[in-house]
């Protein structure tokens, strides 16, 4: 099993916070450090500072050495495909070819309203995502003069410099909850499909369906990596699990909910003691998951990163 550490940077994480997390994840043996791409702070206290994902990744590219870096995921609505192509090629060069590019349709209407971004219906955003991915591939890999004319975007004569360092292109991750359209988009454009909010049982069912969609489209299912974004909270004993659970609830402004919030999520989280965490990770592996993005809601707790590395990455 391969592991990435994924943080929700909109929890008020400064650049210094994210650098500390990325370096700690690198030292702990994680393959990849991923961060969300949001412009508003949530859940919990509104108004906390949020940082731009690609500005942060550019900095991390120069201040880490081994760990891969990326977004999970960048909404199609935030950036024109030409702008995203330039950003990703630049960060790939700055990192020496350590970039993963996670993209999705976006979902949080409030942050779009707060920053003046249009937020069309999901069907339109999905169309935009398909066009964005075609343009990314074309600008990264196509010849000078490559052109595209779609419903939402036009590129009359493409030319991108620098090109990405990774050949033929940085890996693309398409994320979602396993809808038919997200699977079709992943099969057409992605190197990896990332399933969110799924139990091991649902993951097995969705991955099997994804393989069928790939075969029907004439693609070898083995060429499309299966991964899952999985909430992660681990403690050395039950007392430490309880302490970290309370810290998450406090940060989310949900202390009054007690254990109910975690009880609802435990069937799809890596949660508990080291033995419980390893057992749940094994269930995801048996479901066909090749990489787990450990979604860490404790970005101020660097010892939690150490423990996740000890128990899962190196365990």
What is the predicted role of each segment?
Residues 1-315:
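Active-site-adjacent structural elements that line small-molecule/cofactor binding pockets in enzymes
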């Amino acid at each position: 099993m391969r592991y990435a550490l994924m943080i929700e940077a909109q929890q008020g994480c400064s650049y210094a916070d994210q650098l500390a997390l990325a370096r700690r994840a690198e030292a702990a043996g994680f393959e990849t450090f991923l961060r969300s791409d949001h412009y508003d702070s949530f859940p919990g206290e509104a108004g906390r500072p949020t940082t731009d994902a690609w500005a942060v990744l550019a900095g991390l590219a120069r201040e880490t050495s081994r760990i891969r870096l990326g977004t999970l995921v960048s909404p199609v609505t935030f950036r024109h495909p030409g702008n995203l192509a330039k950003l990703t090629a630049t960060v790939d060069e700055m990192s020496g070819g350590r970039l993963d590019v996670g993209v999705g349709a976006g979902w949080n209407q409030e942050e779009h309203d707060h920053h003046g971004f249009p937020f069309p219906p999901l069907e339109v955003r999905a169309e935009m995502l398909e066009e964005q991915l075609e343009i990314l591939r074309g600008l990264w890999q196509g010849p000078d003069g490559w052109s595209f004319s779609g419903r939402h975007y036009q590129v009359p004569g493409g030319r991108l410099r620098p090109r990405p360092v990774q050949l033929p292109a940085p890996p693309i991750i398409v994320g979602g909850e396993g809808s038919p359209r997200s699977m079709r988009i992943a099969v057409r454009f992605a190197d990896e499909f990332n399933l969110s909010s799924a139990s091991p049982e649902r993951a097995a069912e969705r991955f099997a369906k994804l393989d069928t969609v790939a075969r029907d489209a004439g693609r070898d299912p083995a060429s499309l990596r299966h991964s899952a974004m999985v909430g992660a909270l681990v403690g050395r004993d039950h007392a430490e699990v309880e302490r970290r659970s309370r810290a998450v609830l406090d940060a989310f402004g949900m202390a009054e909910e007690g254990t109910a919030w975690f009880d609802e999520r435990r069937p799809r989280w890596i949660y508990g003691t080291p033995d419980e965490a390893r057992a749940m990770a094994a269930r995801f592996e048996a479901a066909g998951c090749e990489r787990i993005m450990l979604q860490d809601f404790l970005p101020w707790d660097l010892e939690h990163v150490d423990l996740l590395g000890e128990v899962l990455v190196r365990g």
